[in-house]
């Protein structure tokens, strides 16, 4: 049941955590982002590019969460109080797995939010982001590949709204994703050669960092 997880930062002990409705979580996060969004830089403003969280990215994130909140999804039927006053339109149910495939009845409100903020991300708040539709390399003339070549050249593509840097030879005291699960040192003749040939996560903290009874554990890593 993706989404119905413990939520909140004020709890200190495992026993203090219970499940929270995904719809309550969506509503809380959407409202927090909507409050912060007007005060943020767009991509290209304040020296920020797609390696930093910007107003452009937040607009897209609000839109994406609103689509998830209003879309069809599996919901639990074994905890009737979990979703509070939220009403649903149900397509099917599964008594064995105690779930239903449904969407909330007021889904249009969320689709309106999604349309509004996704449009902002693509227009008024797009900043310097743009689709790569041309290729200045006469020998290639492949705009699709040009987008990915920016990454291979250790540059940020103008299409990138937000991404975490994951490249070779970037010295830092912090742990970026290049440090996790790499099968080589990133040399040109050994995969992955520079970026994105194979990014994996080794969730050692998943196995050893949580009490088995801690309900946060299973949603803290993709195994």
Where are these regions (language model features)?
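Conserved, well-structured interaction surfaces
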Residues: 1, 12-55
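An aromatic- and glycine-enriched ligand-binding surface/loop that stacks and positions planar moieties
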Residues: 5, 26, 34-35, 52-59, ...
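Short helix/strand-bridging catalytic loops that position acidic/His residues to coordinate divalent metals
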Residues: 10-18, 47, 94-104
């Amino acid at each position: 049941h993706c989404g119905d997880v413990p939520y909140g930062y004020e709890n200190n002990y495992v026993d203090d955590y219970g499940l929270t409705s995904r719809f309550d979580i969506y509503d809380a996060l959407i409202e927090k982002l909507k409050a912060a969004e007007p005060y943020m830089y767009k991509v290209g403003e304040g020296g920020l590019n797609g390696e930093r969280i910007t107003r452009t990215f937040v607009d897209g994130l609000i839109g994406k969460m609103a689509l998830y909140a209003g879309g069809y999804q599996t919901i639990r039927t074994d905890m009737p109080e979990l979703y509070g006053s939220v009403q649903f339109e149900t397509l099917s149910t599964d008594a064995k797995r105690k779930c239903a495939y449904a969407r909330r009845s007021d889904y249009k409100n969320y689709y309106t939010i999604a349309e509004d903020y996704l449009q902002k991300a693509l227009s008024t708040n797009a900043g310097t982001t743009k689709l790569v539709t041309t290729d200045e390399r006469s020998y290639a003339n492949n705009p699709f590949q040009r987008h990915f070549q920016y990454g291979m050249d250790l540059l940020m593509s103008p299409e990138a709204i937000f991404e975490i840097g994951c490249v070779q030879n970037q010295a830092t005291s912090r742990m970026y994703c290049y440090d996790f699960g790499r099968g080589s040192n990133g040399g040109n003749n050994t995969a992955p050669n520079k970026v994105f040939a194979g990014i994996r996560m080794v969730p050692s903290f998943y196995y050893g960092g949580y009490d088995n009874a801690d309900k946060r554990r299973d949603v803290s890593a993709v195994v």
